[in-house]
Design a protein with these regions (language model features):
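Short, membrane-interfacial amphipathic segments enriched in basic
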Residues: 2-38, 215-220
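Membrane-interface helix starts
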Residues: 32-57, 238
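Active-site cofactor/substrate anionic-group-binding motifs, chiefly glycine-
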Residues: 45-99, 103
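Hydrophobic alpha-helical transmembrane segments in multi-pass membrane proteins
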Residues: 50-63, 97-106, 146-167, 196-209, ...
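Membrane-interfacial helix-loop-helix connectors in multipass membrane proteins
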Residues: 69-93, 160-202, 210-232, 251-260
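Hydrophobic alpha-helical transmembrane segments of multi-pass membrane transport proteins
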Residues: 83-126, 211
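Short cytoplasmic-facing helical segments at TM-TM junctions of multi-pass membrane proteins
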Residues: 118-141, 223-226
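Start (N-cap) of specific transmembrane helices in multi-pass transporter permeases
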Residues: 134-155, 229, 233
Length: 260
């Protein structure tokens, strides 16, 4: 019984260490641009293609839902003019980076795991190693950089679409004036908020690619093992993202003075 209890934490620590090692190997191969730049462009296009439309379909109604809550609360306090400021803070600081990360992990990350996992069970990874081709530099490095790059584009797209959805709901449904909505943008928002949003998106995209590539490289058990690796990769990525998001948000509030 004691062995069964202690084996779980040991497995988690070992998995985390292996993921960290894979990510370090991927970062180490970044200077070898000649090896990975073509695959990097292909992965950027693929991730953007599979995530752009879903992220738009999510961000617009998501912005409307936030506008519903913020607008109702502001009306109760008699502070409708603060609706725009609260909307920008909610979307730019938290909603946009997290939504971007979840889409990259769910759509792009699952495809990465399935692709690398399929190569693994067909012994293509072993064949690359036999031919002295580093699978980390060839497969992992371009995906790490591609997911991080596309995340920067998607977080901007989510922010604009979410604020547009919030504008439609606040102005047309809740009858907040357009001037009050837009004037609130500068009341509480500051430039570090935008940098924080971009930093979160980059880190979350990197985490999604790191976990996905790792689960693909170490999957076992044939086609069923690939499916299990895809499911595990998505779940682990979500856990990492929410944990890292808490840490980054805490550090941001501790280091950056707020406009209140």
């Amino acid at each position: 019984m004691a062995t069964a209890i202690t084996s779980k934490p040991a497995f988690v620590v070992r998995e985390a260490g292996n993921m960290f090692a894979v990510s370090l190997d991927g970062i180490r191969d970044i200077p070898k641009i000649r090896i990975w730049w073509q695959e990097y462009l292909r992965q950027c296009w693929f991730i953007a293609k599979v995530t752009s439309v879903p992220v738009m379909l999510i961000s617009i109604p998501f912005g409307m839902v936030i506008a519903l809550h913020v607008g109702s609360f502001s009306r109760q306090l008699g502070a409708e003019s603060a609706t725009g400021a609260a909307m920008v803070l909610a979307i730019v600081r938290e909603a946009a980076p997290v939504a971007t990360a979840l889409l990259i992990a769910g759509a792009g990350g699952s495809a990465m795991t399935a692709d690398i996992g399929s190569r693994k069970i067909r012994d293509e990874i072993a064949a690359m190693e036999v031919m002295a081709v580093n699978p980390i530099g060839r497969l992992v490095t371009p995906r790490l950089l591609a997911a991080s790059t596309v995340a920067l584009f998607l977080v901007s797209l989510v922010s604009v679409a979410g604020l547009a959805g919030g504008y439609v709901f606040n102005v047309l449904v809740q009858h907040v004036t357009a001037g009050a909505y837009f004037s609130g943008f500068t009341q509480l928002v500051q430039l570090p908020d935008l940098w924080q949003s971009l930093a979160k998106a980059w880190v979350f995209g990197f985490i999604a690619a790191m976990v996905s590539c790792y689960k693909g490289l170490y999957c076992k058990g044939g086609p069923k093992g690939v499916g299990d690796a895809v499911n595990q990769g998505v779940v682990i990525t979500f856990i990492f993202i929410f944990f890292v998001n808490f840490i980054m948000t805490t550090l941001y509030f501790a280091l950056v003075p707020q406009k209140f």
